[in-house]
């Protein structure tokens, strides 16, 4: 039996690192990647894998550094461009994320995650129709991805197409992938449609799968607050303002301050009291009367 070649041995080490990342055993994955780099200091894929670990551990500066080292050795390393796009997106450097995605799409035009990232950015910027188009492209490439289908549901909800949104939400759930990301996006979609019970159910599933994720925990707490109808009623104007341009919001506030000043003051006081009361009720529901940090 012939012995394994050096290239085959390196491929086995790549697979080992990827497997550890999939298991969220990031410390071991880092040790394996660093050991590989000691043996193969010019291995662009090893640098890209190390960068990927740092994205997963939310150390975005390190992820950008090591992906840059990978691209110095191979300017078209596919994983390195994907890591850079995610690192910029997750650290809220959205313009740089778009630039990285553009370059990544040139290198790997059939990678659906670039279209997904662009869609997420356009959703954040209120460009819902463009976002929907990018999500549909991602689904054309990978039709069985539950997170992409959930994002299409969210985009449809933001566009006011609630029937289509519910249909895509069902399709995402039928893909039967246990993913905290998918459940979180479906929760956003349900909230946008006004399906608050469904919103809370999806958040419960997300937090079950990843109870330590800060974004999911915060969304779950907010979901519990919004389960109180009075809070939702008072929150409605602020939800509407999010869809408006800043100058429109300013004009409405100025007009309300001039015409309805006493009522506006009462509304603000009631809103603040309701916000903190529901926050207290949620805390007591989850943790009892203990307020220790």
Region locations from a protein language model:
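Register position in tetratricopeptide repeats
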Residues: 22-23, 56-57, 90-91, 124-125, ...
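Canonical positions in the second alpha-helix
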Residues: 35-36, 69-71, 103-105, 137-139, ...
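Short coil turns that delineate tetratricopeptide repeat
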Residues: 41, 75, 109, 143-144, ...
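Alpha-helical linker/edge segments of TPR/alpha-solenoid repeat scaffolds
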Residues: 196, 222-246
């Amino acid at each position: 039996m012939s012995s394994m070649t050096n290239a085959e041995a390196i491929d086995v080490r790549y697979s080992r690192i990827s497997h550890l990342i999939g298991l969220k055993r990031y410390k071991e994955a880092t040790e394996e990647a660093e050991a590989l780099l000691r043996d193969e200091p010019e291995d662009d894929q090893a640098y890209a894998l190390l960068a990927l670990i740092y994205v997963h551990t939310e150390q975005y500066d390190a992820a950008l550094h090591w992906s840059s080292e990978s691209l110095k050795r191979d300017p078209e390393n596919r994983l390195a461009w994907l890591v850079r796009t995610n690192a910029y997106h997750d650290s809220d450097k959205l313009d740089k994320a778009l630039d990285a995605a553009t370059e990544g799409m040139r290198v790997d035009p059939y990678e659906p995650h670039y279209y997904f990232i662009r869609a997420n950015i356009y959703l954040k910027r209120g460009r819902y129709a463009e976002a929907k188009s990018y999500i549909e492209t991602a689904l054309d490439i990978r039709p069985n991805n539950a997170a992409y289908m959930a994002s299409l549901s969210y985009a449809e909800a933001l566009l006011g197409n609630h029937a289509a949104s519910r249909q895509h939400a069902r399709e995402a759930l039928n893909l039967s992938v246990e993913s905290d990301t998918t459940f979180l996006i479906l929760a956003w979609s349900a909230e946008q449609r006004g399906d608050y019970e469904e919103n809370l159910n999806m958040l419960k599933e997300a937090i079950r799968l990843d109870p330590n994720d800060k974004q999911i925990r915060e969304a779950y707490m907010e979901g519990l607050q919004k389960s109180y109808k009075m809070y939702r009623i008072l929150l409605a104007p602020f939800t509407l303002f999010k869809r408006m341009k800043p100058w429109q919001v300013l004009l409405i506030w100025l007009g309300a301050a001039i015409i309805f000043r006493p009522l506006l003051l009462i509304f603000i006081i009631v809103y603040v009291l309701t916000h903190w009361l529901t926050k207290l009720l949620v805390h007591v529901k989850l943790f009892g009367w203990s307020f220790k940090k």
